[in-house]
């Protein structure tokens, strides 16, 4: 059967009391091969204490017994019966050093220090090691080793026995101890007591140490035993596997000698740990190398001036090294690796000096990883013969070796060395040896693995023995693949709606060999932020200094909008200590399993693991963990060093990169050198995201510092609440920079705040010192505020505070508006429980409500701790908190001993309107109308009388006398405070005591004063040499000037050539673009790209061209033209390939010409953006756009029914032609338009042109749906309460409310008014509103309170909707939700829907649309103006109010007052009323007067039957005296806009001529017109055109009319001019 083995190799450096100094130069014995001793110098016997010092003690801790039994022995009795494990042990020593002590056998030669043969060691006889009875009685086992035991154990031929092992059988002892024993296992190995042989015990003790004794512990199953040969494993049966784990005790440093790390003494009486070059030989014929010979042999040699004749009397006899050579060569003696902890470490070498020296001695120090340096040897003065050479070694940082070189000069050079020692290399007691266990696992085929590779879910042995059933028998949680459940992992607090960790199969992972169960968490379909925690079983504390590791596989699939952390929690006394060992955040996984190894360092107590996952909305990820294991190294391996020198970063790798056949390589886990400390590292402490009067919490600081090198503990109660506690990492000089927080801003002066103070000091700190750091927080600002009343004060709309100040000269009732004081930043230590301040950086005072901008408070600094740290004086506002004062005022900042919380606002401010301006954490005082005081060592004072112009004072800063002030206190911080700690760079070696460190090379570079440079030595500064000019200045200037002129000439010539070529290309391109063939081809085949990308805001969200649905040009087919739109031609077309739509789809295509202005392009794209954002059944749908090619297209839904106005006119009932319409049809049309308007209103859009001409029908027959179709004048009012129209514009006057054409204000209520006019159009069947009235008359009529009569046969409820829409005050008009509700009531009223439509007896539609023929030269005929003669006739006539139109609903018309007289233009009699058909007798003239000459291709006719007569400015070449005066008159008006009156103004009467009216002409012609009505006109920016039909008017220029200027209107327009 196979065997399960545990092999312990425990070197003698365990808890040994070995004494190497007991065999010095005064303790020698003759060599057994050199004859009888001459002068015995050793004692006859050793005392008990001396014998104890010769022993080697092994102490195996009891914790190892517990862990080995729990982890490696089967727990159940059934398993014991099936194959009871056998625990065996032995103590092994190398035979070679022991046989050297006995002397070489005849015919056998051996060399001290020579390596063992390469072949395997010979099997040796195992000696009996002792019994359990002795161990239980004496609590330890003592083994004595003598010559008989050496000869019995090291058996075999002499050549093979020298490389064998001497072993003591300890199987019975170890088997009992591992199963039933208690306490530690103590084994003492010591020399056998031989009193008859003087000095034999000392030499035997040294030989035992040189033989490297170790303990071999094994645990085997039933089967072959390998105790006799730990290196030769039994041949296992193929049906079984074999476990064999080797544990080795070694010294803490791999290359240090096992004898003494801190001292060495060698007298060459027996083999030492020295190395020789050439190697040491004992044969006489080897004259070229070192030889070890007794002194008696040297005295018999015939050596001139040799050691035997000239040896000093005081020197004892014995063996020494001899070198006798005639060649010029170098011979070396090399010490083992050593350490030194004392500055007095010295090398002492006893050599023989001849009268005529033929060589010299040189000693060198060889530190590890450093260059060698020579040791100066000082001989004993004035002495030849035997003398001592001494050299100082000191205290090197790294381990070192010492080399003694003898350089011969030929001619029979002779060297003799009697003594080699390193003395005084340790201070105090030398540290004892440390337990070091190195483990390995041997597969049955001999493959050696590290113990950490066993039970790690990766098969490293060929037959898989390392992942066999034994791994599954480990305690719960040690080896978990979740195939049998949660393996001891438990959920946190469970909630019915919280996602939970589950154990199930992840089938779609991208690792085909990993399809088993795993621990999963799904973050998908969670509406809000959630978190989930799962906790492992509790694990025992690892052995100290063990290379403990956690191994696991993890996977994230999908997008994780959160983080996952692995936290290690120790069961410390009191509070649980948790630290994060792994973290991943905002991860986009690829469903790929990752393998990760995490080192678990400095774990000294029982611990458990927690997986904490947090995610937010939108996270769609699955987090999985599997194959979690704790390495056996945690409990069965000890490195021998206090700290594990390894990289603490997780070793994570892809599972595909894992090599399953990787074997252990020599030196793979050798300790790394301690990294050099980076002096550029600094620690930055912040508020951890906290603000206000209270400090941060532990969770906030953990989150803030999770990706930094900071780890703090935050106080949670008492005066230390919110204070960060930090441990100093190393003893050094540190630079501590403290920054206080700024004060809050006042209500009026929001531009400046009081800055926090910075203090920088230099302090000496010790390692593990605890620094208490309170980071000050900014005082709260008075503005802005979420309180609407306070916000009005902030923006200046409410002046109640100023009014109270003006009346009472103080503020009491309306107190508030001052900023809170900033908190101070404290850095202090604790001494006997009392805080000791190091640095205090004061906070800035809060600014007052009406603070002045020129106030200045100088910085104040205190360094005398005897000065009391008092709070600042408090008034209405709170004073700042100090160091150790008390206060009972809630609005005052608290001192540090009271918790340093910020003060609240004054009670007056909180009581009146809840104006909260609290002080910042760190003792900031609360604000009132005056500012709060800043915190500090002494708090800042606040104003005593609530002066609204008095700021709070800054606090007083402090620096401890223990430190050095590096820079003066300065006010620099504009926000929260900070603390920055870094290593202080010592620049004392520099000439100016200032330096910096190069961030790349980490070298210190000194600064120099201005005008000097750093010398080559890197320390001193020298004056920079002034370079002498080599060429005259005149020559340099002439060359530069000539080159510059030549360059300018060449550049100018090149520019002209390029310009001429570009000009010619542009002309050719313009000619090509103007050709009709090019335009037609571009409509179908153009592929010119555009990069224009405007932004538009819809309902608070930014939109751009990228949001539009782009339709490829190849999918668009143009069929026929439909007309001319606002930008270009409109075509009927078809679109194919549109998803969710029939193919082909009939569309209307609006085009933008290629040659257009930038404003036209912007307006076109803006309309596309607006229409594309609407999604309503009563708004024309935007199918898509085609903007990537020229000309650009907008694809709209094709409305076959045409516009609503034409439809109503065509379907009027006539005597000869009854209509298919009913009153219910008209109500349905009105309801559809109201639904669309409600949608626009809810999305904060104003259409500004709701009229029948802009509404389209899906079909003319039944089932028609009305939709709003033109958005050329729509505007987004999401961010403003109204839209003010400015500039030059043409507006539909008859559809506009008074505030729109009087003041240019457009709101959603504007569309309500327009909808009332639309209702009138619908129920009048397409008549022009305000029949027989011109635009000017409509202005007068509406502003005087007049409203239209109901259309013929209009139901009363419908007319009431119209009148409610025509309310004078916008807030009195209903919204469209109410309008829809009332229209629905009308559709259910039988009296309404049964009302018959009126029969039309007027002219046909074709006749209504006709317009009188215009003259061929319209420019020669001026538009009509109000004549001066008419004005004079009105002045002579008695003043009488003009007749008002009939008011709505049959109400009697009010008699207008003098202030309400409308401006009327004298005209002929006209029929008034709501149903006169004269308005529709107009037609479009084919005159050139109305063509548009702008950049847009507008309709060629300016006549619009809906808008009336539009007017455009066009200069004329005819001379006219009135025209010469007109520009001057308009220039004096001070009006905005670019619209001007045509200068060709003449008197005349022309039917249908346009009448131009300006505010100036109104005021000049009608003196009784009230100015308050006219000053709200758009100041000439909007030209209102209207037509008069058959009215005899005489136009004349009114004197002084052009000089009218409304100063109020001018100032208003100059101050408030919103954009269109």
Swiss-Prot record:
Changing residue 1174 to L: In NBLST3; somatic mutation; constitutively activated; retained in the endoplasmic reticulum and Golgi compartments. ATP binds at residues 1124, 1150, 1197-1199, 1270. Residues 437-473 form the LDL-receptor class A domain. CDD domains: LDLa, MAM, PTKc_ALK_LTK. Pfam families: ALK_LTK_GRD (PF12810), MAM (PF00629), PK_Tyr_Ser-Thr (PF07714). GO terms for biological process: adult behavior; cell surface receptor protein tyrosine kinase signaling pathway; energy homeostasis; hippocampus development; negative regulation of lipid catabolic process; neuron development; peptidyl-tyrosine autophosphorylation; phosphorylation. The keyword NAD does not apply. Residues 1-18 form the signal peptide. It is found in: Cell membrane. It is a single-pass type I membrane protein. The keyword Transferase applies. The record marks 1057-1058 as: Breakpoint for translocation to form the EML4-ALK fusion protein (variant 1). Changing residue 1234 to T: In NBLST3; somatic mutation. The active site is at residue 1249. InterPro entries: ALK/LTK-like_GRD, ConA-like_dom_sf, Kinase-like_dom_sf, LDL_receptor-like_sf, LDrepeatLR_classA_rpt, MAM_dom, Prot_kinase_dom, Protein_kinase_ATP_BS. PANTHER family: ALK TYROSINE KINASE RECEPTOR, TYROSINE-PROTEIN KINASE RECEPTOR. Neuronal receptor tyrosine kinase that is essentially and transiently expressed in specific regions of the central and peripheral nervous systems and plays an important role in the genesis and differentiation of the nervous system. Also acts as a key thinness protein involved in the resistance to weight gain: in hypothalamic neurons, controls energy expenditure acting as a negative regulator of white adipose tissue lipolysis and sympathetic tone to fine-tune energy homeostasis. This is ALK tyrosine kinase receptor. It comes from Homo sapiens (Human). The lineage of its organism: Eukaryota, Metazoa, Chordata, Craniata, Vertebrata. The gene is ALK.
